Amino acid sequence: MSVGVWAVIPAAGRGVRFGSPVPKQYLPVVGRPLIVYTLEALAAHPAVCGLMVVVAEGDLAWSGWTELAGKPLLTCSGGVTRAASVLSGLLALPQVVHADDFVLVHDAARPNVALSDLERLLEAGCAHPVGAILAVPVRDTLKRAGSDGSIDGTEPRERLWRAFTPQLFRRSQLVRGLQVAAADGIEMTDEAMVMERQGLRPLLVECAESNFKITTPDDLVRFEFELARRV
């Protein structure tokens, strides 16, 4: 595709669920910080023309990179929530990124997105009136639990998907939706939710299961295995 996009990568989280004293995006993987793999995966696509990494205020672990694969790599300070950090990143984008331009938002701890999946997201999302997200259909059987921990019932899974990233939307629509949600005190857990709240219906683009997020130590082991397979 010929349309150039910037990517916003919220990386201000502390990784509390991971249980490490080091934020998980900076954990060493084969001698390099995890976030480097994420940034390289995005920068590898020719349509990605710049990266905005949103770091925590006073982040001492960030190495101060300003360029990756010949593309500008900028930083700004994030907020206390993921949504606040995404909003900060969107507002800090350079002037070359216009209000109606599409922007990618991608988790810092999701380092294994395939170039082919990114290509399909950009092709489908930029042709869609709203935008699109990478996602995976739910394939497991889902059970609804009662308050006592027993099974209350089985949920139909035919139309359920697991939302992944990157997610691709127009900058102005995301900014507006995030600002309104913040004013209303509503937590937005992903960008698609922001669009849904505006009455918009983003497109689902199926991607590989290997585009998983590093949330637990087991996930990190899995990513190391994926890296070994590349050799």
Swiss-Prot record:
Any GO molecular function: 2-C-methyl-D-erythritol 4-phosphate cytidylyltransferase activity
Top-level taxon: Bacteria
Pfam family, one: IspD
Transition state stabilizer (site feature) positions: 17, 24
Pathway: Isoprenoid biosynthesis; isopentenyl diphosphate biosynthesis via DXP pathway; isopentenyl diphosphate from 1-deoxy-D-xylulose 5-phosphate: step 2/6
UniProt catalytic activity: 2-C-methyl-D-erythritol 4-phosphate + CTP + H(+) = 4-CDP-2-C-methyl-D-erythritol + diphosphate
Chain ranges passing through the membrane: none
Record site: Positions MEP for the nucleophilic attack: 157, 213
Keywords: Isoprene biosynthesis, Nucleotidyltransferase, Transferase
InterPro entries reported in the protein's UniProt record: IspD, IspD/TarI, IspD/TarI_cytidylyltransf_bact, ISPD_synthase_CS, Nucleotide-diphossugar_trans
Function in brief: Catalyzes the formation of 4-diphosphocytidyl-2-C-methyl-D-erythritol from CTP and 2-C-methyl-D-erythritol 4-phosphate (MEP).
PANTHER family: 2-C-METHYL-D-ERYTHRITOL 4-PHOSPHATE CYTIDYLYLTRANSFERASE, CHLOROPLASTIC
Family: Belongs to the IspD/TarI cytidylyltransferase family. IspD subfamily.
HAMAP family: IspD
Name assigned to this protein: 2-C-methyl-D-erythritol 4-phosphate cytidylyltransferase
